[in-house]
From Swiss-Prot:
Residues 29-50, 123-127, 209-238, 287-299 are cytoplasmic. The lineage of its organism: Eukaryota, Metazoa, Chordata, Craniata, Vertebrata. GO terms for cellular component: membrane; plasma membrane. This is Taste receptor type 2 member 42. Its main location: membrane. Gene3D superfamilies: Rhodopsin 7-helix transmembrane proteins. Receptor that may play a role in the perception of bitterness and is gustducin-linked. May play a role in sensing the chemical composition of the gastrointestinal content. The activity of this receptor may stimulate alpha gustducin, mediate PLC-beta-2 activation and lead to the gating of TRPM5. It comes from Gorilla gorilla gorilla.
Length: 299
């Protein structure tokens, strides 16, 4: 039977789901209708639409996950149900994170201005580079899934035996293996974060350089390019902030679940973990002029 704490958690989880679904469905519908009307799909719209679809899939998994944890948390520790849910959540989370990273890289090359030949060469081949990043993310997904499967097997094995007395050497060996696997998973998560961080740093350098050039030419410090720089920086920095919250919440959730799996407060760590897919869509809407204007007209 659900406790009062479970009911509060489920109400918050459902509210988080509905709000985020509205944002992502809106992004998908606007971009699809624009693509049909113009008979052309721009790279930014394609990435945004793919990100919205991926996030919708992740939100559905999160909702099922929330009901499972809130109403029948004991089923989460079974191989038949717990393992597929964790694997599916990881896949959708991986795709969402990498698509958001590709969007950050796209904004950087689309908006920033550097005279360096390497930057110009990469900018000219931007679509191909985004495709290469997506291919890299698929290879990393295969690697991560293999590591995660071993991680889950060991973790559920520990939970299954938690009521028994494990030999000290056996217990130490299992936890050592978990530490190594968690490190590998954290390292692969660091790749999209570092790419987005690099994008926002170079966007800032480009903005400083552009503003200095405007002042030297007596044109002031505000023009369309400056505003584009600032909007892109706000979106990428917001993504980085949400990604940091998401990443550390994931580490805390792993620790609580696999070390103290029946702790009642893991539910609220999950709400913080889901802040990234829940809030990111509205940041994208506010930062994209087409989406923002459409939203204003609807309101």
């Amino acid at each position: 039977m659900a406790t009062e704490l479970d009911k509060i958690f489920l109400i918050l989880a459902i509210a988080e789901f509905i709000i985020s679904m509205l944002g992502n469905v809106f992004i998908g519908l606007v971009n699809c209708s624009e693509g049909i009307k113009n008979q052309k799909v721009f790279s930014s719209d394609f990435i945004l639409t793919s990100l919205a679809i991926s996030t919708i899939g992740q939100l559905l998994v999160i909702l099922f996950d929330s009901f499972l944890v809130g109403l029948a948390s004991h089923l989460y520790t079974t191989y038949r149900l717990g393992k597929p849910v964790i694997m599916l959540w990881h896949m959708t989370n991986h795709l969402t994170t990498w698509l958001a990273t590709c969007l950050s890289v796209f904004y950087f090359f689309k908006i920033a201005h550097f005279p360096h030949s390497l930057f110009l060469w990469l900018r000219w081949r931007m679509n191909g580079m985004i495709a290469m990043l997506l291919i890299l993310s698929l290879f990393l997904l295969i690697f991560d899934s293999s590591v995660l499967e071993i991680f889950i097997d060991i973790s559920l094995n520990i939970i299954d035996k938690s009521s028994l007395t494990l030999y000290l050497d056996e217990s130490k060996t299992l936890y050592d293996k978990l530490s190594i696997l968690k490190t590998l998973l954290s390292l692969t998560s660091f790749i999209p974060f570092s790419l987005s961080l690099t994008s926002v740093l170079f966007l800032y350098l480009s903005l400083v350089r552009h503003t200095r050039n405007l002042k030297l030419s007596s044109l002031g410090s505000r023009d369309s390019s400056t505003e584009a720089h600032r909007r892109a920086m706000k979106m990428v920095m917001s993504f980085l902030f949400l990604f940091i919250v998401h990443f550390f919440s994931l580490q805390v959730a792993n620790w609580i679940f696999f070390m103290l799996w029946n702790n009642k407060y893991i539910k609220f760590v999950m709400l913080a973990l889901n802040a990234f897919p829940s809030c990111h869509s509205f940041i994208l809407i506010l930062g994209n002029s087409k989406l923002r204007q459409t939203a204003v007209r609807l309101l």
